Amino acid sequence: MSDILKKICDVKVEEVAAAQKRVSFTDMRRDAESRVLTRDFVGALRAKIDQGQAGVIAEIKKASPSKGVIREDFIPADIAQSYAEGDGKVGAACLSVLTDRQFFQGQPDYLKQARASCPLPVLRKDFMIDPYQIYESRAFGADCVLLIAACLEDGLMAEMEQIARSLDMAVLVEVHDGAELERALRLQTPLVGINNRNLRTFEVSLQTTLDLKKEVPADRLLVAESGILAPVDVHTLRDAGVNAFLVGEAFMRAPDPGRALAQLFA
């Protein structure tokens, strides 16, 4: 685990402990299980791909540890609507909302605001290190959760996936190298995210996705993450057979995020 990732995960341990003092595990589980039906995250991606379009998970992110504040004019509901509409022809399949406070200046309310403003399924983008967070995610309204292989041992990762499935949530499992991919493929989820950013050095290379794609079975849906900034990046990946993408920074820096999405994936 990289230094920054370890630092983030250590903070998460403290955050989960504090959260459980406010709302017990039992109460959070009860809240999660009482929530209304989820939106079909995987189905939304596949529907776009079946139409010949890219399946885009458009991210709502105010800041990051490596770039600082990315978007000053940050209104999650407006951004979500912009993503859903695109240019009227090309729009997002799903949303990803950062809820981490300390490192990404996110918060759970951003997820709630985004989901309430449009019909798209929503991924809670955070660093999951405890089963409590899976129940918490459903209570917040998430339709999908992120499990980062580098943060989790196999047994815990499988347990957290099973909890998510029991709540009818999708799981996006994220990897960066072959060893992590091998572990991720033991899970049942069809969604496999390949992060092109090295969390140790923060260097980004699309070659990471191109290399690892060869090891991803055809029944899994590969999602390319990070470093997708220009049409040439999209063309490179699509030519290699990649059809799903998680993109944030390129849109967050644009005046109209939805139009930027449509232009990137035209």
Swiss-Prot record:
Keyword set, alphabetical order: Amino-acid biosynthesis, Aromatic amino acid biosynthesis, Decarboxylase, Lyase, Tryptophan biosynthesis
Highest taxon of source: Bacteria
One Gene Ontology term from the biological process aspect of the record: L-tryptophan biosynthetic process
Record Gene3D superfamilies: Aldolase class I
GO MF terms held by the record: indole-3-glycerol-phosphate synthase activity; phosphoribosylanthranilate isomerase activity
The keyword Lyase appears for this protein: yes
Annotated catalysed reactions: 1-(2-carboxyphenylamino)-1-deoxy-D-ribulose 5-phosphate + H(+) = (1S,2R)-1-C-(indol-3-yl)glycerol 3-phosphate + CO2 + H2O
InterPro entries (UniProt xref): Aldolase_TIM (IPR013785), Indole-3-glycerol_P_synth (IPR045186), Indole-3-glycerol_P_synth_dom (IPR013798), Indole-3-GlycerolPSynthase_CS (IPR001468), RibuloseP-bd_barrel (IPR011060)
The EC number(s) this enzyme carries: 4.1.1.48
Pfam annotation, one family: IGPS
Pathway: Amino-acid biosynthesis; L-tryptophan biosynthesis; L-tryptophan from chorismate: step 4/5
Similarity section: Belongs to the TrpC family.
HAMAP family in alphabetical order: IGPS_B (MF_00134_B)
Record-given protein name: Indole-3-glycerol phosphate synthase
Gene, per the UniProt record: trpC
